[in-house]
Amino acid sequence: MRVMAPRTLILPLSGALALTETWAGSHSMRYFYTSVSRPGRGEPRFISVGYVDDTQFVRFDSDAASPRGEPRAPWVEQEGPEYWDRETQKYKRQAQTDRVNLRKLRGYYNQSEDGSHTLQSMYGCDLGPDGRLLRGYSQFAYDGKDYIALNEDLRSWTAADTAAQVTQRKWEAARVAEQERAYLEGLCVEWLRRYLENGKETLQRAEPPKTHVTHHPLSDHEATLRCWALGFYPAEITLTWQRDGEDQTQDTELVETRPAGDGTFQKWAAVVVPSGQEQRYTCHMQHEGLPEPLTLRWEPSSQPTIPIVGIVVGLAVLVVLAVLGAVVTAMMCRRKSSGGKGGSCSQAACSNSAQGSDESLITCKA
């Protein structure tokens, strides 16, 4: 079984994107596919979203009035109509592949036709500061549980249960991992570098966090100190609390980084302290947009107002992203990269459906 990955364009990449090109920090490209069956209500709904770093740049929804690959970032809008035609056809093929795979998985798990089931996948690659591959991913899940995943060596698979072992044996016989590795080390890297160049004003920016420390009395004896970081990009940030210079990791409540809804992110870290001892505690913050790490204390004279509305919006966006991209592992394989042209594929588990596209994929059956 296979999830098709949006390997968007098979055009030759420009010399400006040569391997010697470098960027500050590491970067990533991720695609998330979700197919949900709905017995008695037509074909499964298929949704795909693609991200470079923390920025969504493409989306497809089979339930749209006119389903097409849609740009979600200005720097991808410059791609021509042929690009979007290929993207759209790719997603439509993948929706049909997932429909077949959902049926096969239902059989693997001896499930009835009555219930709704979900097939998810994530794939992509990470680049280091030198523009070279750090790590590749190809992971799949069924009904919210791990199914099968390509290991970090890009040469072997980890199956979560006996059903996934059936798929694993098929893929091992078909040498699917080799095709996965060829894509991840080739086109995935090339296209991520292309996107980083085209979108460098957005993707390679660094917006420092707006910072506050707030004080929230719990009782006459205790209070919560909360260290806020708002409006920062990229999403990677470090927040820690110290008391008299000693880390308070075990006693710190730390939320996941949240999208703010405007392309930036939010995060906070909180610690409960004895009343009257607040000045012994310091918040330490590190972010790419800061010239040097910050050290913050609560200032009793000025309790800043935290933009609660923005935080609520951020939480709403987080929920949407979790629904669309709550992905880890499910099933997938790609045809071998060969300059973007459809390669021959005789494996019983897979069939080539990437002719004339940049997907460099094969559609595989579980």
UniProtKB/Swiss-Prot annotation:
How does the annotation summarize its subunit structure?
Answer: Heterodimer of an alpha chain and a beta chain (beta-2-microglobulin).
Query: Is Transmembrane a UniProt keyword of this protein?
Result: yes
Give the residue ranges for region: Alpha-1. 25-114
Cysteines paired by S-S bonds: 125-188, 227-283
Q: How does it sit in the membrane?
A: Single-pass type I membrane protein
User: Where is the segment annotated Alpha-3?
Assistant: 207-298
Signal sequence bounds: 1-24
**Connecting peptide: where is this region?**
299-308
Keyword list, A-Z: Disulfide bond, Glycoprotein, Immunity, Membrane, MHC I, Signal, Transmembrane, Transmembrane helix
What is one GO biological process annotated to this record? Answer: antigen processing and presentation of endogenous peptide antigen via MHC class Ib
- Pfam families (UniProt xref): C1-set, MHC_I, MHC_I_C
Enumerate the residue ranges of region (Alpha-2).
Answer: 115-206
Give ranges for the Cytoplasmic compartment: 334-366
Q: Where are the transmembrane segments?
A: 309-333
Official protein name in the record: Class I histocompatibility antigen, Gogo-C*0201 alpha chain
